[in-house]
C-alpha cells in the first residue's frame, strides 16, 4: 500500500461527525438593517439608485401609464419593445396609443431579427419582481414572456416596480419570494442602476454593457404620497 493509499484508508476509517448547519437566516434577521417607516426605507432605496444615475418616478396604479408615456416622449424615443404576453405590457401599449412612439412586441426568436434588435430598438419595458432597500436594487426574473435581453440590449430600460414588494435586504427577498421553497427561476438578476464601467484611468462610462438609462416607474401604495418622498430623497 502506497503512502497515499494508507492516508486515504485512515481517513475513510475515521469517525465522521456531521457538522451542524449554520443558522444563516437567523443571523441575518438579527444583524440586518431596518428603517423607522416605509417612507424612510423608500428614501434610502431611491437615494442609492439615484446615486448611480437611475431615474425614478413616483407613480400610482392609476397614473403610471401617463407618466410612462410622458417620460418616453421626453426621451424622443421612436419605438419601445414591450412584453405583450404580460398584463403590464398590454397596458403600456395602450398608454402609447396615438403617440409618435411605435410599440413593438417581443415575440420573435432573437436569431430571426438580431441585427434589427441590436441597432434599431430604442428602449425596452419590463416589470420588476421586487426591490431591495439596503443596496438600492431591483430583482427581476427572466421568463419566456420577459427574457433578459428585453432589459439588457436596448439603450433605455423602463421598469415598472410595485413598491409594496420592497424588502430590507437580499435575504429578506429570498425568504419573501420563497426562492428556496419554490425553486429558482432559470435567471434572476439584480439591477442597481444603468450599465456602467470604468477603465484603468477611472473614466466612468454608461451604457457599455447594457442600457445607458434606467427609468423606474415606482408604484406607491395609497397611504404614501410622492411629496413625502421627494424631501431629501
Swiss-Prot record:
Q: Which InterPro entries match?
A: FTHF_cligase-like_sf, LUD_dom, NagB/RpiA_transferase-like
What domain of life is recorded for the organism?
Answer: Bacteria
The family note in this entry says: Belongs to the LutC/YkgG family.
- Any remaining note in the record? Present in outer membrane vesicle formulations which are used as vaccines in human.
Tell me what this protein is called.
Answer: Uncharacterized protein NMB1437
The record lists the lineage as:
Bacteria, Pseudomonadati, Pseudomonadota, Betaproteobacteria, Neisseriales
Amino acid at each position: 500500500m502506497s503512502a497515499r493509499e494508507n492516508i486515504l484508508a485512515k481517513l475513510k476509517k475515521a469517525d465522521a461527525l456531521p457538522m451542524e448547519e449554520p443558522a444563516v437566516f437567523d443571523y441575518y434577521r438579527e444583524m440586518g438593517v431596518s428603517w423607522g417607516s416605509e417612507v424612510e426605507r423608500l428614501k434610502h432605496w431611491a437615494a442609492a439608485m439615484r446615486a448611480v444615475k437611475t431615474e425614478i418616478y413616483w407613480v400610482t396604479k392609476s397614473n403610471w401609464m401617463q407618466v410612462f408615456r410622458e417620460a418616453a416622449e421626453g426621451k424622443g424615443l421612436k419605438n419601445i419593445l414591450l412584453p405583450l404576453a404580460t398584463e403590464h405590457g398590454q397596458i403600456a401599449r395602450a398608454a402609447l396609443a396615438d403617440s409618435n412612439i411605435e410599440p413593438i412586441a417581443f415575440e420573435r426568436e432573437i436569431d430571426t431579427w438580431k441585427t434589427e434588435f441590436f441597432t434599431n430598438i430604442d428602449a425596452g419595458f419590463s416589470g420588476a419582481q421586487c426591490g431591495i432597500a439596503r443596496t438600492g436594487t431591483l430583482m427581476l426574473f427572466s421568463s419566456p414572456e420577459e427574457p433578459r435581453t428585453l432589459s439588457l440590449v436596448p439603450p433605455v430600460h423602463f421598469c415598472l416596480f410595485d413598491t409594496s414588494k420592497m424588502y430590507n435586504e437580499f435575504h429578506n427577498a429570498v425568504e419573501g419570494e420563497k426562492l428556496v421553497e419554490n425553486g429558482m427561476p432559470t435567471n434572476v438578476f439584480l439591477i442597481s442602476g444603468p450599465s456602467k464601467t470604468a477603465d484603468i484611468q477611472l473614466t466612468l462610462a454608461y451604457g457599455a454593457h447594457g442600457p445607458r438609462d434606467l427609468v423606474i416607474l415606482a408604484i406607491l401604495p395609497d397611504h404614501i404620497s410622492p411629496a413625502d418622498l421627494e424631501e431629501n430623497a
